[in-house]
């Protein structure tokens, strides 16, 4: 089972090896109070506009290394990638995991205090991190410049389960699985109900919003894009369907993501890194 999701889990050893000879390395810090610990990695001057990256399930803040390592993005953004509660060293009240989308979103709000620029924050969430990003944006819309959801799992009627899903709930099997995998399983089995709670939220999102979905995504049903079109009421929204893309769009279409982030007029300029066939 773990091999199915190994690409989403990055060990500390792999991180050390990756940055062993790097000239610029992310700064890893812990935001902590009496009940909350948030592990974050940041790179770029903190006086630059913040780009906040929220991972899926399972996942890690290091799942965005390719974006954090991009020199052009480093020059223009204070890039902050966070371990959601239940992943890495991020915890809330010593709980192993938190399945509530609202609680997850509220737990991330202290990160906004790290924004020392005069501009609002760009929030990017992918997969299971997308609805958490959206909920967070709905809580502090005045602090957010734009919302980008990549391969979002947001339709409560399109939750996918696999042959191995039920085994992930077995307490004996869980003893041999990475903690992040068990956290993801807990999230998955409550996700549809949590997404139903999100239904009234979508109409309250009015910041510029971009939704990107792949046609060959085996985790997020492509119809999640139709759900977004129907429920998001922002007049400044765009929807991008990549016919041949899978789930890992932030890797396979990194140049497109990068160009989107660097565009100062996101909703007026054409995204040239995307070819006319939507590949």
Give the label of every model feature segment.
Residues 73-91:
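Conserved alpha/beta-hydrolase
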Residues 103-120:
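Conserved acidic catalytic loop of the alpha/beta-hydrolase fold
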């Amino acid at each position: 089972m773990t091999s199915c999701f190994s690409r989403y889990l990055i060990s500390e050893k792999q991180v050390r090896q990756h940055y062993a000879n790097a000239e610029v390395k992310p700064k890893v810090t812990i935001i902590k109070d009496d009940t909350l610990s948030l592990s974050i990695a940041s790179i770029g001057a903190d006086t630059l506009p913040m780009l906040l990256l929220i991972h899926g399930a399972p996942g890690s803040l290091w799942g965005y290394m390719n974006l954090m390592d991009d020199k052009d993005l480093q020059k223009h953004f204070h890039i902050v990638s966070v371990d959601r509660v239940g992943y890495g060293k991020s915890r809330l009240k010593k709980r192993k995991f938190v399945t509530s989308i609202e609680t997850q979103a509220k737990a991330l709000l202290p990160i906004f205090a790290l924004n020392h620029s005069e501009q609002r924050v760009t929030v990017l969430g992918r997969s299971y991190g997308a609805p958490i990003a959206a909920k967070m944006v709905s809580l502090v819309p005045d602090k957010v410049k734009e919302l980008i959801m990549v391969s979002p799992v947001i339709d409560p009627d399109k939750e996918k389960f696999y042959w191995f899903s039920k085994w992930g709930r077995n307490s004996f099997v869980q003893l041999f699985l990475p903690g992040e995998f068990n956290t993801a399983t807990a999230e998955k089995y409550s996700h549809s109900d949590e997404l139903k709670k999100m239904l009234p939220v979508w109409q309250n999102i009015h910041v510029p919003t971009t939704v990107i979905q792949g046609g060959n995504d085996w985790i997020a049903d492509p119809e999640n894009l139709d759900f977004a079109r129907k429920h998001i009421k922002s007049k400044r929204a765009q929807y991008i369907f990549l016919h041949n893309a899978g789930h890992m769009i932030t890797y396979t279409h990194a140049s497109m993501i990068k160009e989107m982030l660097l565009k100062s007029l996101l909703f007026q300029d054409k995204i040239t890194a995307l070819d006319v066939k939507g590949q």
